[in-house]
Amino acid sequence: TNWFDLAWKNPFTTQHNLSVNGGSERINYFMSAGYYSQSGTFNNLDFTRYSFRSNVDAKVADNFTIGLDVDGNMSDQRTPYWPHDSDKDLMNDMYRALLNFPTTEPAYINGKPNATIYNWNILEAINNGHVSKKHNTLNTKLSAKWEIPWVEGLTANAMFNYRRYYENEKQVGKEYTLYIHETSGGHNHIIRDDAPVVGTRTRTENGNFVRKDFNETSAYTLNLQLNYNRTFGKHDIGAMF
């Protein structure tokens, strides 16, 4: 039995992007949206992301302009729950187990997950448990520029930034039933393709639980600035406050 081949699935990637831009003498805008999806190489392994961006600049008056920039993304990642991996995203130990699992024992007999000799079935461990992570990010920037009319060369700038980040992780571990089949041979090491079931075994190394973790952060900054730039003859004067 080639356990890696049985677990492997051909991955697929889908990506779509749409953008619009335009404007007039007083206003300019750019908007875009994106979709990205990738199916994994194993069960319970996939990734989906939605993203958007909007930039609008408007000249409210001859000496006053404002801008609004908004971007964000929403992603959903799903991986098998494998308690032996310290890094759930890389799954190094799961790959190692698939490549090194003994090939002498069939994975399934008559459609039933087999665990006659080695007491567990790595394919069922992958199928029965997952980790799902949802990430949402929102960035907003509001800016304004005022060219002060009664002082030539003096401009006032203001910028407000807001960022919000949301993360929700859910781990699901399920117990599952494996089947012990009749063996033959001098060392009871042979399992026929049509071997009858002689017992069952319930595996709980994935636990039997649901755990949720939630994290949300937000931050904002406000910058106020005065700039003075003016030329007197051959001399340039600049200052920032």
Residue spans of the language-model regions?
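Residues embedded in well-ordered regular secondary structure
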Residues: 1-44, 81-84
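Outer-membrane beta-barrel channels and translocator barrels
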Residues: 13, 24-25, 61, 147-151, ...
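Outer-membrane beta-barrel architecture
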Residues: 19-21, 32, 55, 141-145, ...
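Surface-exposed loop/interface segments of Gram-negative outer-membrane beta-barrel transport/assembly proteins
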Residues: 1, 40-47, 51-139, 155-241
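Acidic/polar N-terminal loop/beta-strand segments that form early-domain functional surfaces
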Residues: 23, 32-34, 71, 147, ...
